[in-house]
Amino acid sequence: MLKVLFAGTPDVAVPSLKLLAQDTEHFEVVAVLTRPDAPTGRGRKLVANPVKQAALELGLPVIESDPSEETFVSELAATGAQAAAVVAYGKILKQDVLDALPMGWYNLHFSLLPQWRGAAPVQRSIWAGEKVTGATVFRIVRAMDAGPILAQSTVEIGAHETAGELLGRLAEDGSHLLAASLQALADDQIAPVEQPAGAYEVAQKITVEDAHIRFDVPVFAADRQIRACTPNPGAWCELHAHADAEPATLHVLRAQPADMSNPNAPASLEPGHIVAGKKNVWVGTSTEPLELLEVKAQGKKAMRAADWARGAHLDNAFCE
C-alpha cells in the first residue's frame, strides 16, 4: 500500500482526493496539504477551500503550513508519506521539499504536456481552437510543468464546450489517470519519461482584460474566446443599449455562431452591432453574426439572451 500525501486546493482537485482516499486497497492518504482558509464574499469571512472541506469530511489530517517555512520538511517526514499527489495546489515547492519524499511529487496537469505548460491550459486550448486535449501525470521538478511524464490520456473538446465544462470532465477523468499512474509506479510497472524538447505554447493566466470580447474578428474566434473565458474570469463587453443609455457591462455566458439556415438570422452585421428578434439575439463579427444565448447584464441575474433583450430597450445597440 502506497502512503500518499495529497496536495490541492480548488474543486477540480476534489475528485482525485476522493478517489485516492476511497481506494484503501492501494493507497493510504496520510495527510492533505492545502492552502489556508481565505476571506470570501462581502463579509470577508474565512472559508475553507473545497479540498479542505472534502478532507475533513473524509476524516483526513489537514496541513496548511507554508512549504517555504523551515519546519515544513520535518512536518512532511512526520506524515510517513512515500509520494505526493498534486492537483492545483497553487504553491511553488522548493528543491528540499521535492527531495523530502522517497518517491517524489506527482502532478496532474490538464493538458498534453509539453504543450500548454502554465496556469490556464484548458482555457488556452479552447481559445486556440484545438480539437483534442487531455491530462498528464508527471514528476514535479523546479522548472514549471517540465518534469518527466508518467502517463497521459486524451479527450475530445466539444464544439460548444466551455472551459469550466471541459475542466470538470478532465478533473474526473484525470483522477483515474493519477490513481492508476501512482499504483503502477508503486508496483514498478512504469517509470517517468523525459518530456520531448522543442518549442511549445505556454498557458498564461487569463485576465479580466483578456476576457473583453473582440467582435472585430471572425465569428469562430469570438466564440472560442467566450468559451475559453467561461466561467472565469467571465467574457464581457461594454454595452451601449441606446443613445441615452450609459455604457454598462454585459457578461456573455453562452453564445454560438449563428445558424444561417434560420431565415430570421441577419446575413451580416457590423462588428459589435446587436439585432434582436423574438427568440434570438445576434451580434456582428467580421464574418457571420454570433448568436447570444445567455447573458448577465450589470446588476441583473443571468438569463436567456432573448428575455434580456425584451427588457433592455435596445435601439441601435452595440457592444465594444
Curated annotation (Swiss-Prot):
It is an enzyme of class 2 (transferase). It holds the Pfam family Formyl_trans_N. Keywords: Protein biosynthesis, Transferase. Its EC number is 2.1.2.9. SUPFAM superfamilies: FMT C-terminal domain-like, Formyltransferase. The keyword Transferase applies. GO terms for molecular function: methionyl-tRNA formyltransferase activity. GO terms for cellular component: cytosol. CDD domains: FMT_core_Met-tRNA-FMT_N, Met_tRNA_FMT_C. It catalyses: L-methionyl-tRNA(fMet) + (6R)-10-formyltetrahydrofolate = N-formyl-L-methionyl-tRNA(fMet) + (6S)-5,6,7,8-tetrahydrofolate + H(+). (6S)-5,6,7,8-tetrahydrofolate binds at residues 111-114. The keyword Transport does not apply. Belongs to the Fmt family. Attaches a formyl group to the free amino group of methionyl-tRNA(fMet). The formyl group appears to play a dual role in the initiator identity of N-formylmethionyl-tRNA by promoting its recognition by IF2 and preventing the misappropriation of this tRNA by the elongation apparatus. This is Methionyl-tRNA formyltransferase. The gene is fmt.
